[in-house]
Amino acid sequence: MHEPTQSAIPAPLVRPSVAGRLMDISITADIDPTAEIGPGTMVWHLSQIREYATVGPNCILGRGSYVGPGVILGKNCKVQNFALIYEPALLEDGVFVGPAAVLTNDRYPRAITIDGVRKSAEDWVLVGVTIRTGASIGARAVCVAPITIGRWATIAAGSVVTKDVPDFALMVGTPAKRVGWVGRSGVPLEQTDPAHFTCPATGERYRELEGKLSLL
């Protein structure tokens, strides 16, 4: 019988306790000692959490995900496999980041200065992506900092977001444009009259005014 190689065997989760709070963390995860991980959070195989990052309680960080220095994640966030969250990103509660999505941090990237010298940290002006409560970033989407993704917004898979996104917006394309609205359930809303929308999943009603949507 063929025996699986060591690399083919999934890395087990361990349950470290910090001040009596349990977490599920893969033994292959790379977590800086200065990072803070909330209770109930799961960190999977080959994930990396950098120095002074904060991950709230009950989050899930998928295989190969990356959380940069000083990044902040609220509670109940889900970061899927190979998603990259670069500093100084801020994710509020309940944010979803899909597989291989990227949150950038350099508006005008260059490897070298105009003198041909390799850039150092001192030459780098960091800008971040802020994602508000309940928003979702689809697989392989790119959020180009500095931008803010509004509450409960949805960014479709593969989209490239270069501008701020309003609450409840459904954004599609490159560059991403609003093609509709979504409710808190994530389901696209149905328009009932020129200014009102209903969620077919929950029955919640919304009103659009001057390009912004609010829950009634």
Where are these regions (language model features)?
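Active-site/binding-pocket entry motifs
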Residues: 108-110, 177, 205
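Short, non-ligating residues that shape and space the ligands of small metal-coordination modules
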Residues: 191-192, 207-210
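Cys/His-enriched microdomains
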Residues: 178-181, 197
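Short cysteine-rich clusters marking metal-coordination/redox-active sites
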Residues: 183, 199-202
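Flexible, glycine/small-residue-enriched loop-and-beta-strand segment within the central core
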Residues: 12-27, 32-33, 42-148
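Internal alpha/beta core interface subdomains
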Residues: 151-154, 160, 206
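Cationic, low-complexity basic patches in intrinsically disordered or flexible, solvent-exposed regions
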Residues: 4-7
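Short, intrinsically disordered, charge-biased short linear motifs at domain edges
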Residues: 167-173, 182-191
